[in-house]
Amino acid sequence: MYFIDGESVYRYLKNSDMNCIIIDDEPLAREELSSMLQEISGPTVIGSFSNVLYAEKFLSENEVDLVFLDIQMPKMTGLQFIEKIPKSSMVIFTTAYPQYALESYELDAIDYLLKPFNNERLQKAIHKARHY
């Protein structure tokens, strides 16, 4: 595990067809999603960030296939931050608030996952991203 600006950046050596980062201000949500992705052999988590400023720096220096992005965060919402994500990266919104679903699709998100996450729904979202 490496540290960049106080944020954990995970490096897994397993083979994966896709990498991802997780951006969420809630530590338990980040840990839960990372753990679930490992369990289902999902994309390799290469970064986990509690704030968009660290994530923006990481995205400017690394190629990221998929971004799991929380909507309600301090300083900037996920709906605002999506504009700063490179167009080559796909976005799956993660939130406890269903009222943002329509807006997220209008911003070209691949999918929209409600917390708490469940494996079946997560697998469907990843399948959509892999076949996008």
Spans of model-derived segments:
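Short, structurally constrained coil/turn elements
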Residues: 14, 39-42, 85-87
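Short active-site oxyanion
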Residues: 18-19, 44-46, 88-91
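Generic detector of well-ordered alpha-helical packing
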Residues: 25-26, 71
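CheY-like receiver
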Residues: 52-58, 62-132
